From Swiss-Prot:
Keywords, comma-separated and alphabetical: ATP-binding, Cytoplasm, DNA replication, DNA-binding, Lipid-binding, Nucleotide-binding
Tagged with keyword Transmembrane: no
InterPro entries on file: AAA+_ATPase, Chromosome_initiator_DnaA, Chromosome_initiator_DnaA-like, Chromosome_initiator_DnaA_CS, DnaA_C, DnaA_dom, DnaA_N_dom, DnaA_N_sf
Region (Domain II): 86-129
Region entry Domain III, AAA+ region, spans: 130-346
Name the UniProt record assigns to this protein: Chromosomal replication initiator protein DnaA
Family listed: Belongs to the DnaA family.
Quaternary assembly: Oligomerizes as a right-handed, spiral filament on DNA at oriC.
Cell location: Cytoplasm
Function recorded in the entry: Plays an essential role in the initiation and regulation of chromosomal replication. ATP-DnaA binds to the origin of replication (oriC) to initiate formation of the DNA replication initiation complex once per cell cycle. Binds the DnaA box (a 9 base pair repeat at the origin) and separates the double-stranded (ds)DNA. Forms a right-handed helical filament on oriC DNA; dsDNA binds to the exterior of the filament while single-stranded (ss)DNA is stabiized in the filament's interior.
GO biological process: DNA replication initiation; regulation of DNA replication
Molecular function per GO: ATP binding; ATP hydrolysis activity; DNA replication origin binding; lipid binding
Source species: Salmonella dublin (strain CT_02021853)
Pfam families the UniProt entry points to: Bac_DnaA, Bac_DnaA_C, DnaA_N
Length: 466
């Protein structure tokens, strides 16, 4: 047996797992085979525990399939694989911790370091961190919709400049991207209080560059941004059509990456879908790890409301949280705004927070939601999105070009309306409720497996909720 055994396992796991999961958890592992033991080295304890918990059976199954009774024992360790003189296979043939995507010909990947090795000597500028100390990992409510994004952000905070550089988070407004940026900043500074961590909106970068040009201070501008330890930029899509800003950020990006300085970017859309941004920048955005944050599912919305109420020392009955979460689905910001209004009304009136009270306090907001999202509206939006007719959604046609949009529309109706499964089935040509249930489960499965389906679902949710 040789290291090619692990390479065979990698090839199979890459086929079996969603691309994001493989890049985040499997690719950073290093392997060493010795004395019939396959040692897998994880970059930190978090990755080790996650892989052992989630993928141990997958890996053991592959080892047994490839080797039968001679399958090696599996051992997990934190750290990097020791290099010995007897190792015949070059180190670069083993998946390195910093390799998170297919290698780019124009970039030489930096060696894996902590992110703080060879930090430049203290520079003249006074760094404006702008990191909000209130946004931490502890008060970020985790759910299925944001689990991968939070895990990736946590690893970056623990190992800046390491495996996931750059980290690119994308999703609709109010889903927690900014919270995670601040949480990473707080995490880095908790470990290294003197770290130069800068958070900013992309428009601030543009404003600073314009000011530097006006004051003939472009060199100071470059020195400021290229000597930070971590640069966290929100809403990168606002660089669109700003050619000089893109040019300067391109060189800043390259300088930071070469110095193992961490970059985290957020956007409201997938990198390649950002219009008005140069292809060379969009390509670099995808060099590290790209993770989507989707609208929170019902259970997460309830958890967000309960946590927010607890932070305000307010007792929120579970049935009230469920009532609000069931009706307000688009994003976290909307949920928190609604709860703030309920709390304010309760404080002003001295009344208990009940479902009837919430109906009254949020009357206009709930009416607007019910008016905006109807099954008819969903059918119209889905038909336009997939360029088919509404009649096709209601028909008995079973071709994939029609069946998949129909399943998508049914899943959206279940997610965005209060209609029962039989009612949804009736609205789609008199179909049985079991057909609707199958459609919902199918779309949920495809969202895990297919980037295109995940994007379609998120885009349609955003359109219908806006």
């Amino acid at each position: 047996m040789s290291l090619s055994l692990w390479q065979q396992c990698l090839a199979r796991l890459q086929d079996e797992l969603p691309a994001t999961e493989f890049s985040m958890w499997i690719r950073p592992l290093q392997a060493e085979l010795s004395d019939n033991t396959l040692a897998l080295y994880a970059p930190n304890r978090f990755v080790l525990d996650w892989v052992r918990d989630k993928y141990l059976n997958n890996i053991n199954g592959l080892l047994n399939a490839f080797c039968g009774a001679d399958a090696p024992q599996l051992r997990f360790e934190v750290g990097t694989k020791p290099v010995t003189q007897t190792l015949k296979t070059p180190v670069h043939n083993v998946v390195a911790p910093t390799q998170t995507t297919t290698a780019q010909p124009q970039r030489v990947a930096p060696a894996a370091r902590s992110g703080w090795d060879n930090v430049p000597a203290p520079a003249e500028p006074t760094y404006r961190s702008n990191v909000n100390v209130k946004h931490t990992f502890d008060n970020f409510v985790e759910g299925k919709s944001n689990q991968l994004a939070r895990a990736a952000a946590r690893q970056v905070a623990d190992n800046p400049g390491g495996a996931y550089n750059p980290l690119f988070l994308y999703g609709g407004t109010g889903l927690g991207k900014t919270h995670l940026l601040h949480a990473v900043g707080n995490g880095i500074m908790a470990r290294k209080p003197n770290a130069k961590v800068v958070y900013m909106h992309s428009e601030r970068f543009v404003q600073d560059m314009v000011k530097a040009l006006q004051n003939n201070a472009i060199e100071e501008f470059k020195r400021y941004y290229r000597s930070v330890d971590a640069l966290l930029i929100d809403d990168i899509q606002f660089f669109a059509n700003k050619e000089r800003s893109q040019e300067e950020f391109f060189h800043t990006f390259n300088a930071l990456l070469e110095g193992n300085q961490q970059i985290i970017l957020t956007s409201d859309r997938y990198p390649k879908e950002i219009n008005g941004v140069e292809d060379r920048l969009k390509s670099r955005f995808g060099w590290g790890l790209t993770v989507a944050i989707e609208p929170p599912e019902l259970e997460t919305r309830v958890a967000i409301l309960m946590k927010k109420a607890d932070e305000n020392d307010i007792r929120l009955p579970g049935e009230v949280a469920f009532f609000i979460a069931k009706r307000l689905r688009s994003n976290v910001r909307e949920l928190e705004g609604a709860l703030n209004r309920v709390i304010a009304n309760a404080n002003f009136t001295g009344r208990a927070i009940t479902i009837d009270f919430v109906r009254e306090a949020l009357r206009d907001l709930l009416a607007l939601q019910e008016k905006l999202v109807t099954i008819d509206n969903i059918q119209k939006t889905v038909a336009e999105y997939y360029k088919i007719k509404i009649a096709d959604l209601l028909s008995k046609r079973r071709s994939r070009s029609v069946a998949r949009p129909r399943q998508m529309a049914m899943a959206l109706a279940k997610e965005l309306t209060n209609h029962s499964l039989p009612e949804i089935g009736d609205a789609f040509g008199g179909r049985d409720h079991t057909t609707v249930l199958h459609a919902c489960r199918k779309i949920e499965q495809l969202r895990e497996e297919s980037h295109d389906i995940k994007e379609d679902f998120s885009n349609l949710i955003r359109t219908l909720s806006s």
